């Protein structure tokens, strides 16, 4: 840059600083780049698929999927992990369906959890914004976007048409709270439902509710699906779950993770550690027997997972080894942010 341009830039920066305050414009090379802080999802495979070890703080995250696919369970697992780190969490229950007993079984400290059951969509989003601006909340879950009913729709007749009302509400709210979320370093998770588009001939007919604004404002979008049942004999005790990272602004997207959700217990983390340990060479498998550091830990996956549950120190060491190996390479954030947009509802078969 020649001297005249340098002087012009310095004058412009000085004027901006006087008018808008110090730090309104910064040169990125003047500051050390810090890793994006993350909160674990409670699933080791999903943390690895997300690229930074969990969901990013100071960002908006959308989790969507069919009914009974594990959306609320996953968010409650995130809250449980955040509370273990001393975080303060809030749950905006627009569906009025939160079960405190079930949340407690998943490890959530329900006594410390802030819960709101708003009457209208405007009230829910205003409460969310006020909690964010308090700078005292670390995680907020909104369950769900489909239940954020505009006040005009609630006060109107059952057959009244309110075209685009919810989409406009979401667009306005997200414009308002995005900056506050970044300043407060708060993770805000929106749970969303799936609807079918009429008359789609090619491509997926699936779409999410609440318009397109959330798709743009979300830094991470997760598509969660139930792929099968977990059985003990003839009894179904859980569900096989697949989560695809269909959008990721903080790491490369389109990775996926598969894990089990056990009814009344949540994500089967110890089972995941056994599978990932075998896959990456930390756990030896010989026939039905599993061994770790040369010592047998159990016959069959269930017994080996029980051994990890009974020996939390060994489980923590194994988890750290897996995380250190699979999360050492720093993601190319700039490349991820500048990647060309794609159809986020497409099926992407890329295993971790």
From Swiss-Prot:
Binding site for ATP: 65-72
Coiled coil ranges: none
Record-linked InterPro entries: AAA+_ATPase, DNA_recomb/repair_RecA, DNA_recomb/repair_RecA_CS, P-loop_NTPase, RecA-like_C, RecA-like_N, RecA_ATP-bd, RecA_C_sf
Subcellular localization, as worded in the UniProt entry: Cytoplasm
Annotated SMART domains: AAA
CDD domains membership: RecA
Gene3D superfamilies in alphabetical order: P-loop containing nucleotide triphosphate hydrolases (3.40.50.300)
Pfam families per the UniProt record, alphabetical: RecA, RecA_C
Listed SUPFAM superfamilies: P-loop containing nucleoside triphosphate hydrolases, RecA protein, C-terminal domain
Main location: cytoplasm
GO molecular-function terms, A-Z: ATP binding; ATP hydrolysis activity; ATP-dependent DNA damage sensor activity; damaged DNA binding; single-stranded DNA binding
Keywords: ATP-binding, Cytoplasm, DNA damage, DNA recombination, DNA repair, DNA-binding, Nucleotide-binding, SOS response
Cited PANTHER family: MITOCHONDRIAL DNA REPAIR PROTEIN RECA HOMOLOG-RELATED, RECA
Entry similarity comment: Belongs to the RecA family.
Function recorded in the entry: Can catalyze the hydrolysis of ATP in the presence of single-stranded DNA, the ATP-dependent uptake of single-stranded DNA by duplex DNA, and the ATP-dependent hybridization of homologous single-stranded DNAs. It interacts with LexA causing its activation and leading to its autocatalytic cleavage. Plays a functional role in the DNA rearrangement associated with the phenotypic switching from a pathogenic smooth to a nonpathogenic rough form in this bacterium.
Protein name per the record: Protein RecA
Gene: recA
């Amino acid at each position: 840059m020649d001297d005249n341009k340098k002087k012009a830039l310095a004058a412009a920066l000085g004027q901006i600083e006087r008018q808008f305050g110090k730090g309104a414009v910064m040169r990125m090379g003047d500051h050390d780049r810090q890793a994006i802080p993350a909160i674990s999802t409670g699933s080791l495979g999903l943390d690895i698929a997300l690229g930074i070890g969990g969901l990013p703080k100071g960002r908006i995250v959308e989790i969507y999927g069919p009914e009974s696919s594990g959306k609320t369970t996953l968010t409650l697992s995130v809250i449980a992990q955040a509370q273990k780190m001393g975080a303060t969490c809030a749950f905006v229950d627009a569906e009025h369906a939160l079960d405190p007993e079930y949340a407690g079984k998943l490890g959530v400290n329900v006594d410390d959890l802030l819960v709101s059951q708003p009457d209208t969509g405007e009230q829910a989003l205003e409460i969310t914004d006020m909690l964010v601006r308090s700078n005292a909340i670390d995680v907020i879950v909104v369950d769900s976007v489909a239940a954020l009913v505009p006040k005009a729709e609630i006060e109107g007749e059952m057959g009244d048409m309110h075209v685009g009302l919810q989409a406009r509400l979401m667009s306005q709210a997200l414009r308002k709270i995005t900056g506050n979320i970044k300043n407060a370093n708060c993770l805000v998770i929106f749970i969303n439902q799936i609807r079918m588009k009429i008359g789609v001939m090619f491509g997926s007919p699936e779409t999410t509710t609440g318009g397109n604004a959330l798709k743009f404002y979300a830094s991470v979008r997760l598509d969660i699906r139930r792929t099968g049942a977990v059985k003990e004999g003839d009894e179904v005790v859980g569900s096989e779950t697949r989560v695809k990272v269909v959008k990721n602004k903080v790491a490369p997207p389109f990775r996926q993770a598969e894990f089990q959700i056990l009814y009344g217990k949540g994500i089967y983390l110890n089972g995941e550690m056994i599978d990932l340990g075998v896959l990456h060479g930390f756990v030896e498998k010989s026939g039905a027997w599993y061994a770790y550091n040369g010592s047998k830990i159990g016959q069959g996956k269930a017994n080996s997972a029980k051994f990890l549950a009974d020996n939390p120190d060994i489980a923590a060491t194994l988890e750290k080894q897996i995380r250190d190996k699979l999360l050492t390479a720093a993601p190319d954030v700039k490349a991820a942010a500048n990647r060309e947009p794609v159809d986020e509802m497409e099926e992407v078969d890329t295993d971790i």
